Amino acid sequence: MNTEIKVYYEDTDASERVYYANYLKFLERGRTDYLYNLGFTHKNILAKYKFYFVVKNCKIDYIKPAYFEDILKITTEVINISKVKIFFHQHIKKNEELFV
């Protein structure tokens, strides 16, 4: 599943590069869109199943910086599901070039 995100000025630091922590927000949007695409929202999962998602572990390799006004593509894939865990693999690209 892919999500497109435009980098806004608020996402950047003084050099107009995406501030490193903001990539986590972009990845969260990708996971949320993944669930929406399956017909779920965080609110209906909590109401119906009485649970919510927490991020226990996250590893990021910063390969190349993104800049103000870039259009990024976040790809989200589920790689493993158990009764209590979902493992996602995500990456961020611009024009098919890997950034994160």
Residue ranges and their predicted role:
Residues 1-56:
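Hot-dog-fold acyl-thioester-processing enzymes
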Residues 1-3, 36, 66-71, 79-100:
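HotDog/MaoC-like acyl-thioester-processing domains
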Residues 11-13, 61, 70:
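Acidic side chains
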Residues 23, 64-66:
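Short, structured secondary-structure boundary patches
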Residues 42-44, 59-60, 92, 97:
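Short, intrinsically disordered/low-complexity patches at protein termini
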Residues 57-62, 74-75:
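Short structured motifs
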